[in-house]
């Protein structure tokens, strides 16, 4: 499911810039995030029921971009509403299972969060015209 094929009320996304816990190597971080943390969320029904989609985007290595200030990965969590996000982090299972696991591999104090609304699509594939704020594109390029 993507934004373009989602029907219904606008979704919210929690985008988190993640940094690994000091002393943990990049590969250890990636392995724990992929093989332990993600499956832990997915296999906990009282958490999984609140979230529409959970994406893990590990940092590309070698990273040619500077200025990312040690970000090791980006987590994107899709929710139907802010209320669903609040319910997700309020679940006892989150406090008992997920929060302690996060401390095993994340630098909790260095995480940066952004909660976003429905996106404005500027480009939707090669050569595709996307509607902007003024309506459908005419195919002209600026």
Question: PLM features: what roles do these ranges have?
Answer:
Residues 6-142:
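Macromolecular interaction modules
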């Amino acid at each position: 499911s993507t934004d373009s094929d989602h029907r219904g009320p606008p979704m919210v996304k929690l985008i988190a810039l993640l940094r690994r816990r000091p002393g943990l190597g990049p590969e250890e971080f990636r392995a724990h995030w992929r093989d332990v943390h993600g499956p832990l969320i997915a296999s906990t029904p009282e958490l999984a029921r609140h979230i529409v989609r959970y994406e893990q985007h590990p940092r590309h290595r070698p990273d040619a971009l500077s200025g990312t200030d040690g970000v090791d990965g980006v987590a994107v969590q899709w929710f139907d509403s802010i209320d669903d996000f609040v319910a997700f982090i309020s679940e006892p299972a989150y406090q008992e299972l997920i929060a302690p696991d996060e401390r095993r591999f994340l630098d909790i104090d260095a995480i940066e969060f952004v909660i976003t609304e429905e996106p404005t699509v500027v480009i939707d594939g090669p050569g595709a015209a996307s509607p902007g704020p003024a309506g459908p594109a005419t195919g002209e390029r600026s």
